[in-house]
């Protein structure tokens, strides 16, 4: 080959796949007490945790567990008990484009839980939504320039490369104690949910520091007359430092997930109660580098053999876009016909199930259904009453989401206030976390071959542009410098229209 090709080996991180799937996870446990005791399930909830994710050819294998907690009464109708159980799962998710031994980011959330009692055994079932993103880091030799004996015209493009060069992860156990109001008359703490938010990331010299807040909603059995159940809300800060293994990177990022929650109440010694909470957090940290590279987009020679290029289409990760936001909401619920009237509200639980989302400028619009469980007391019975309802929601968040982002929507600070005996106002806060990557699609030239070209005779030509032609395609067709072509047609605009006449002067050296 007479032409000389300039090449450079580029290490790039490519987003290979994105997928979503649902898994049904079931578990069972034997309840304490006698088989003849009447048992009623009041509420069933749970959380899902992904322990490992492995990438295969066009698929990913996820392993994890669902931690169930079920509130129920047994025997005495006004005594609320809890049972917790864990069910493991292994789920294969279709992930077109995924490659063996590639990196997989997976996230799980429980969208629905139901439980039933049969023969002294509690059967539990959870519907788990799984979101998966695949990525791989590859080295690719790309063309950055070309030199030819008779001269050559080159067109370049700039690509931005962001890749993870160091990572680390660790589990940290957050222990906190909270004083419970004496007026609640807490007998025992039954269960709790927790959520974690990152507020600050610092680091350097192979370390990353992650700080944030954990919010805890605890459910307690109470000795208050007519109120066997109470709910309290708490906050606690957390801080974790991770050692990063790998190269040095100046762009730091972190994720935190709640992996388990354990709560108990104990006497404080002065007649009050203290809530002891242990929250197991999984913290992941990464360090990225970002660089810009100018590569060859196209080229042609002025004379002699023509160049034919081969290349590869890639989707390159150029940045990270993660954001969180919260919006409060409320709705009025009309209890179904035949439902016992509301005397006093005990607790309310809500799970948002997002069915659609779209971005409008810097806002993300979501809609879906709220799956609601109301626990309350009625005048006609000393046992708590459970009502399950669904209501639609539409909420707009001040978040700019990247395409194919992994979006998590949760509800907390859920509170139900009776309006009348058959109407309840539900107040809640929806918290959204958007985890996405910014990408750039590019066709990268990797090699070139020479082939015989039809020579253009010297002379002065008047050509008329066809649809889709521009200055580059005309100059390439006649094998003349683009600068010479523009100089001969100084009055023509940068964007040529179909039918525009262009003067071309072809003169061999």
PLM-predicted stretches and their roles:
Residues 2-457:
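Membrane-lipid interaction segments
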Residues 450-487, 492-509:
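Primarily a LysM-type cell-wall glycan-binding module
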């Amino acid at each position: 080959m007479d032409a000389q090709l300039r090449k450079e080996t580029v290490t790039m991180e490519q987003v290979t796949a994105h997928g979503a799937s649902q898994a049904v996870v079931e578990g069972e446990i034997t309840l304490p007490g006698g088989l003849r005791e009447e048992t009623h399930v009041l509420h069933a909830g749970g959380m899902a945790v992904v322990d490992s994710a492995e990438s295969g050819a066009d698929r990913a294998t996820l392993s994890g567990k669902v931690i169930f907690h079920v509130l129920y009464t047994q025997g005495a109708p006004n005594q609320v008990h809890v049972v917790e159980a864990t069910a493991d799962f292994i789920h294969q998710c279709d992930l077109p484009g995924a490659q063996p031994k590639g990196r997989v980011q997976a996230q799980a959330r429980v969208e629905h839980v139901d439980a039933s009692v049969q023969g002294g055994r509690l059967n539990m079932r959870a519907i788990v939504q799984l979101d998966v993103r695949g990525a791989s880091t590859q080295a690719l030799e790309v063309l950055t320039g070309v030199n030819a004996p008779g001269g050559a015209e080159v067109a370049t493009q700039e690509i931005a490369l962001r890749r993870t060069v160091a990572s680390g992860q660790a589990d940290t156990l957050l222990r906190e104690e909270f004083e419970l109001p004496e007026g609640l008359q807490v007998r025992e703490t039954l269960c709790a949910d927790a959520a974690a938010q990152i507020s600050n990331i610092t680091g350097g010299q192979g370390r990353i520091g992650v700080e944030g807040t954990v919010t805890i909603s605890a459910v307690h059995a109470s000795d208050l007359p007519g109120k066997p159940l109470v709910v309290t809300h708490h906050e606690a800060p957390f801080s974790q430092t991770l050692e990063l293994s790998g190269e040095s990177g100046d762009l730091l990022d972190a994720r935190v997930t709640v992996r388990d929650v354990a709560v108990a109440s104990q006497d404080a010694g002065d007649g009050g109660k203290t809530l002891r909470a242990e929250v197991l957090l999984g913290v992941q940290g990464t360090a990225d580098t970002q660089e810009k590279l100018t590569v060859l987009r196209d080229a042609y020679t002025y004379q002699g053999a023509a160049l034919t290029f081969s290349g590869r289409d890639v989707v390159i990760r150029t940045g990270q876009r993660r954001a969180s936001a919260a919006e409060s909401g409320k709705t009025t619920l009309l209890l179904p016909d035949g439902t016992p009237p509301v005397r006093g509200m005990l607790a309310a639980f809500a799970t948002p199930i997002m069915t659609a989302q779209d971005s409008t400028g810097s806002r993300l619009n979501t809609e879906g259904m709220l799956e609601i469980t109301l626990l309350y007391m009625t005048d006609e019975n000393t046992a708590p009453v459970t009502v399950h309802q669904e209501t639609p929601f539409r909420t707009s968040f001040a978040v700019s989401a990247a395409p194919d982002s992994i979006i998590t929507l949760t509800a907390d600070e859920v509170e139900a206030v009776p309006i009348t005996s058959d109407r309840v106002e539900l107040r809640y806060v929806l918290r959204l976390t958007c985890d996405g990557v910014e990408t750039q699609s590019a066709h990268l030239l990797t090699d070139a071959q020479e082939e015989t070209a039809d020579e253009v005779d010297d002379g002065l030509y008047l050509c008329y542009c066809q649809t889709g032609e521009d200055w580059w395609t005309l100059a390439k067709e006649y094998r003349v410098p683009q600068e010479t072509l523009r100089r001969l047609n100084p009055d023509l605009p940068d964007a040529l229209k179909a039918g525009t006449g262009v003067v071309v002067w072809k003169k061999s050296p």
